[in-house]
Amino acid sequence: VGGAAVHAGTGKVCAAPSALTRAGFPLPHLARALHDRSPATILVLNSATAAKKARPGSEKDVLLRSFPSYIEETLRARYPDGGVVVTTHNEPRATAEAILPGMPAVLEKTKPALVIWQTGTYDTILGADTSAFSDAVSTGISYAREAGADVIVVSPQYSPHTAFAFDVAPYNNALRWAARSSGVPFFDRYSVMRFWEDEGIFDFDSARPSPSLFDDVHRCIGRLLVGVIVDGVEMRTLGSR
C-alpha cells in the first residue's frame, strides 16, 4: 500500500497510508491567495493556542511546539512569497454545535483562506447524537465557505488510554461523511495515529512517554497536513488551465 513518508526531523519517519494523506478535493481559495501573494491566512480552529511545556526536570524542559507552527514553517518554505500566516482559535471542551454561534465572528476577524477544523473530541466524550454532530459540522463548513475560506476537517486524536472508554468510530464516520458530502478534505488523524501505534512508529501506550513524544507527533501531524494542503492547492479542477 502506498503512502506518504516525511521525516519528523528527529529520525522518526512519519509514514502513513496514502488513503489517509490525500486531499481528495481542491483548495481554491488558498490556492488563489498564494498565487496572488495576498495574505494566505490559515485558521486552526479549536487548537491549543500556546506551546506546551515539558514536565520540569525532564530532558527537554523547553516549550514544545504544536502542529500549527510546523504547518506555518513548512508552508512558508514551500511558498516563500505566499504570505502564509497560521493563527489559532481555541474553544476548549466545546462540541461542534457549541462552536457554531461564534464561528461567523471568528471568521470575520481572521479572514482565513483556509480553516483547519479539529472537532469531535468532546462530542465523543459527551456521547452527542451523531446526526446532530454531522449536521453541525456541515453547517460550520458552510459558514467558512460563505466567508470565502476552504476547509479541512480533522478528526480527534488517538490514545490507547481512552480508546477503550470512548467509541470514536461513529464520530469519525460522521466527520468523513460531512466532509465528503460538502466536498472538503478530511484528515483522519485518529487513524493516522492508530497506524503509528500499530506499526511501532510511536508508542502511545507507554506509562512514561518520552519527553519528545508531544513534539515529534505534532511535527509529524503538521507535515502530513502540509501534504494534504499542497495536494489540495495543486489539484487541477475541471476547466482549470
Protein language model features and the residues they cover:
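Serine-esterase "nucleophile elbow" of acetyl-processing enzymes
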Residues: G3-T88, A105-K111
